[in-house]
């Protein structure tokens, strides 16, 4: 998913891109934001896209910096949220070493570290780490590898037990194409590789960048977000992303 991919989504983002904020069943992400928020603190939204989290961040913090590497997406956010006077906007590629120096009290990053290239992910994590002051907090939302595998199990299990014909079988909302790098957490969704993370992988990775993980929770979604024709009888646990609250300790 390069910059050109996201630039083209500026006018169709709401209809084509999954809305984490809207689909968070238990509002766990907002709860995590509330835990670290203060009208005396500064916050950044790294990978803000069209700014869906800005109306939540703006009233809770002293100032907000909205950051994205797609200028068209950033412009859409700025146009939509002109009334949020404590929000500024910055066009930065977070997969390149940042020249800018920041010391935020908190950073929110929602499903932005998706690249299948390890080197680019490493730079992104390093940019996060150096932009948060000591004892500041990172709220990170990230795709769960456990959930991706669990969803495939549920699809297979449901189809087997019900002996469905090919036309009746339940299917994923996105085509799983090349999964030859599944052992690395790379899941190809509609031919686009997305990095997914194990819970323990997240804790270890964040630790290597000077963070101490304080909590890891599930951001639960309905089955309809993952399965196109999900039976109403499909039980919990539901598919999820991970949300991590981590403190910068080094």
Q: For each predicted feature, which ranges?
A:
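Conserved class I S-adenosyl-L-methionine
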Residues: 1-37, 40-47, 139-170
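Class I SAM-dependent methyltransferase SAM/SAH-binding core
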Residues: 50-96
